[in-house]
Amino acid sequence: MSTLGHQYDNSLVSNAFGFLRLPMNFQPYDSDADWVITGVPFDMATSGRAGGRHGPAAIRQVSTNLAWEHNRFPWNFDMRERLNVVDCGDLVYAFGDAREMSEKLQAHAEKLLAAGKRMLSFGGDHFVTLPLLRAHAKHFGKMALVHFDAHTDTYANGCEFDHGTMFYTAPKEGLIDPNHSVQIGIRTEFDKDNGFTVLDACQVNDRSVDDVIAQVKQIVGDMPVYLTFDIDCLDPAFAPGTGTPVIGGLTSDRAIKLVRGLKDLNIVGMDVVEVAPAYDQSEITALAAATLALEMLYIQAAKKSE
C-alpha cells in the first residue's frame, strides 16, 4: 500500500510496479529524485464514460514494453542516465470523496515541490489537473498552460467537481494566464472570449509541426509552463480508450512530434489524463499515453548535459 495515505488502497495493482520499471519510492519527499511520478485513480468528475481511475495502472503496465530501449529513437540517449525519476505509486484517498482527493493531491504536490522535486502525474479524469495547478502556482506563481485536448474544459456549469471546468476556474483563481496559454487539438464547442489561444484540430492537422511549435513558443514566452495532455486529443483511431472520444483528432505521430517540440519551454509540471482502459483496444490508448509520458521526460532530460 502506498504511504501517501491510510485508507484502503483502491488502486488495485498500480502500486505493484513503477512506470517504465522505475524504482518505487513511497516516501519521495526526502529522496534524491528529480522527477516524481504520481498516479491519481479518480474519475468521479467524469461527464462521459467512467473508468479513468484505472488509467494509472494501465499506463504503468504497458510502459514495461518501453523500458528496454536505452538509446531511445530519435534522442539517442537514455533518459534514465540524465534524470533521477521515481514512481511513488497512487494517491490514496477515501474512495468517493472528491474533496479529500483534491486536498490530498494538492498537499502531496506542495510537499514535493517544496522539496525541489518536479511532478509527472497520471490521471484519472482531467479534474485532477486543478489541484495540481493550485500547488504549482503556490510554488512557481502564475503559469502558462499548454493544453492538449479535444475540449477546452472552460465550461462554466457551476459544478465544483467536473472534468470540463478546470480551465474556467484556474484563471479566476490566478493560477494560469490565459493570454500566455494555448489549447491544442480542440474540436468541440468553446467560448471564444476567454483569453486562451485555441489551435483547433483542423488547423493543427493541416499546418506543419514546426509552424505550430513556433506559435506556441511565441504565446508562452519565458513563463513557467504546466503541460497537460488529455488523451482524447488523439483521434479515436489512435486512442479509443477514453471517456469522451471525438472524431477528427491528432495522430499519435503528430502528437509525439509536438511534445518533442516543447523541449525549450520552461515546463515545471506535467500530466497525462483520461485513459479509460475498459474501452481500449489492444492497449493502444495506454501505449499512446505511456509513450507521450516518456517523451515528456525526454524533453526534460534533453536539457541536461550527459
From Swiss-Prot:
Statement: the UniProt record of this protein carries the keyword Transport: no
E.C. designation(s): 3.5.3.11
Keyword terms, alphabetized: Hydrolase, Manganese, Metal-binding, Polyamine biosynthesis, Putrescine biosynthesis, Spermidine biosynthesis
Residues that bind Mn(2+): 126, 149, 151, 153, 230, 232
Catalysis: reaction(s): agmatine + H2O = urea + putrescine
One GO process term, biological-process aspect: spermidine biosynthetic process
Family in the record: Belongs to the arginase family. Agmatinase subfamily.
Protein name (Swiss-Prot/TrEMBL): Agmatinase
Name of encoding gene: speB
